[in-house]
Amino acid sequence: MKALILVGGFGTRLRPLTLSFPKPLVDFANKPMILHQIEALKAVGVDEVVLAINYQPEVMLNFLKDFETKLEIKITCSQETEPLGTAGPLALARDKLLDGSGEPFFVLNSDVISEYPLKEMLEFHKSHGGEASIMVTKVDEPSKYGVVVMEESTGRVEKFVEKPKLYVGNKINAGIYLLNPSVLDKIELRPTSIEKETFPKIAAAQGLYAMVLPGFWMDIGQPRDYITGLRLYLDSLRKKSPAKLTSGPHIVGNVLVDETATIGEGCLIGPDVAIGPGCIVESGVRLSRCTVMRGVRIKKHACISSSIIGWHSTVGQWARIENMTILGEDVHVSDEIYSNGGVVLPHKEIKSNILKPEIVM
């Protein structure tokens, strides 16, 4: 069985992290975002994943080589020479997705994090006998999104309404699809939208069905949503695999600490914190609602909240980092510095306070 992951372009919304790595390789909960998806696909019998990409394919493939061997799954790239939207990449990868078996294939948006109930989706797809299945999720403010109007009893999709001014429903496209090979015949090789062009055609022919996603869902393509997504992911881990979370007298709420990280005495860590491989957290540090990526050193009595600390950075003693501060790779914050929402590009040294949200070049 095959799957296509829509990787897309430059990840500008997640800069400065994406200045060092393509967005799917940015760590989320201590492993690359895309690895969460590849592992979920492997678990339901997918043996080949095609990455639809237009930026740094060689970096992606080199990085994922080890995981290809470890997970026993084939990973290939389909490279766009121009942006093809959300449907064009399927036409471009047609030969990689068709193997003559007639089996459906998965399509995933690489920005989406969820519990990936792909086994249930396979069963749902077989049960309705339609041409395509999409996953939908309920949201509080549907007017920001394209809303999927569906028949509640069967799941059959009636129509899509883009950013409705009046309430028509609260279910939106969750960016996870299961498609029969025949769907590829409906997509031309040009820049085109699967949501606005392909799916409405299939829905008009009564062949499109929607399954309501159980559990959490988040598009983590920008920093604020990334932080929220981490909270939802750790909540889910607490319910499903609590042994993976860290516990102890210095831990508050849900915290994920890599086994190679070290934490000093008198720290208070949590809630909603991920600490990556090789990190050193010195004594008296306070961390909450943040991600600390691989190889970071946080010195004594520093305080970090609602922020992302990029790979191999250093935060000085008594420094205070908060309010969606994002440190790129290899950033060094001096002792006693305050950052209020600073976005700091890689390889910088911060020697003066950042008093309001700004980009430090």
From Swiss-Prot:
Changes seen on gene knockout: Embryo defective arrested at the cotyledon stage. Deficient in N-glycosylation, altered in cytokinesis and cell wall architecture during embryogenesis. Mutants vtc1 and hsn1 with reduced enzyme activity show reduced root length and leaf cell size, reduced accumulation of ascorbate, increased sensitivity to ozone, UV-B and oxidative stresses, increased levels of abscisic acid (ABA), salicylic acid (SA) and resistance to virulent pathogens and root growth inhibition in the presence of NH(4)(+).
Gene3D superfamilies, per database record = Hexapeptide repeat proteins, Spore Coat Polysaccharide Biosynthesis Protein SpsA, Chain A
Q: InterPro entries in the record, alphabetically?
A: GMPPB_C (IPR056729), GMPPB_N (IPR045233), Mannose-1P_guanyltransferase (IPR050486), NTP_transferase_dom (IPR005835), Nucleotide-diphossugar_trans (IPR029044)
For this protein, the Enzyme Commission number is: 2.7.7.13
List the catalysed reactions: alpha-D-mannose 1-phosphate + GTP + H(+) = GDP-alpha-D-mannose + diphosphate
CDD domains assigned to the protein according to its UniProt record, in alphabetical order = M1P_guanylylT_B_like_N
Q: What is known of its domains?
A: The N-terminus (1-40) is necessary for interaction with CNS5B.
Any idea what this protein is called?
Mannose-1-phosphate guanylyltransferase 1
Species of provenance: Arabidopsis thaliana (Mouse-ear cress)
